[in-house]
Amino acid sequence: MKVNVHDPRGEELAQVLTRATAALAQVPSPRVDAELLAAHLLYDGSRSRLQHAALMGERLTPAQVAEYEALVARRAAREPLQHITGCAPFYRLELSVGPGVFVPRPETELLVEEALKVLSARAESATGQLRVVDLCAGSGAIAAAIKSELPNAQVFAVELSEEAIPYARKNLEPLGVHLVQGDALTALTELAGTIDAVLSNPPYIPPANVPADPEAALHDPDMALYGGGEDGMQMPTAIAARAYELLAPGGFFMMEHDDTQEEAVAELLGRVGFERCYPVRDLNGRPRHSAGYKPATSGS
């Protein structure tokens, strides 16, 4: 994106945005990204303020244009927008993210919505504090969303990655979530059999299904993407078994997975011992999550 500012008053913001949009032609949403980058740099992240400023003919100094150019160049190289701005929107929250941590996706909000339905109903009849666990927490997106909506719940998040933990800590500690750095398959042993809900967005992608988007393929950590084994089911299988151990009788489990894994996950949940299992589909009708309950009694 070449800039040639002749006017000593600077260059009109609207013109700069138009040029940036052209420079970002290869990204999925060039105009939106151009505006979000400018809003991040100049208007405390407020896209509406940016749009108003552009409409009113506001001008940028050469220094501002140069700094903005640098951000646009990074995005044009397919660095994730969220890495550049340092934040990602997720379920009414703005989460801290960056290199080394999985960027939360909109489809995971469906998991949060379904879990909140179940937990809200359970809270009405609960005699004590609800306990919720987020396994493979990454940035802490699921745990943060649950705690923000159910502030009286006791929420735990488990994440192994050294790179992800600083982001999770920044997102979760202000909310009062208990963050544990450790293996999702062995952590929280002292809570086994006492948890009301275990939620997880584990690594699940089969090794042959490398994400098409460079943002994911090149920047999301492999340990957050690939589930292990030819079908990607190694980690989901282990997470389902661990969830069953952590849950109290009647407890709820929900896990995100690839849309090709619906049958495999349904078989897995039944084999582990879950009952009343069901898929949750995204807005395009694809099965992206599966849920089930630990039997309320040992004889069920």
What role is predicted for each listed range?
Residues S139-P151:
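Conserved SAM-binding loop of SAM-dependent methyltransferases across substrates and taxa
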Residues E12, V16, A63-Q64, L160, ...:
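Soluble or luminal CAZymes and related metallo-dependent hydrolases
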Residues R19, L36, E67-A70, L110, ...:
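Alpha-helical elements of Rossmann-like donor-binding domains used by nucleotide-donor carbohydrate transfer enzymes
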Residues E149-A296:
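S-adenosylmethionine
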Residues A115-A126, Y244-E245:
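Glycine-rich helix-loop-beta junction characteristic of Rossmann-like nucleotide cofactor-binding loops
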Residues A39-V118:
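Conserved AdoMet
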Residues T127-C136:
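Conserved class I S-adenosyl-L-methionine
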Residues M1-L55:
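Non-catalytic accessory regions of SAM-dependent methyltransferases
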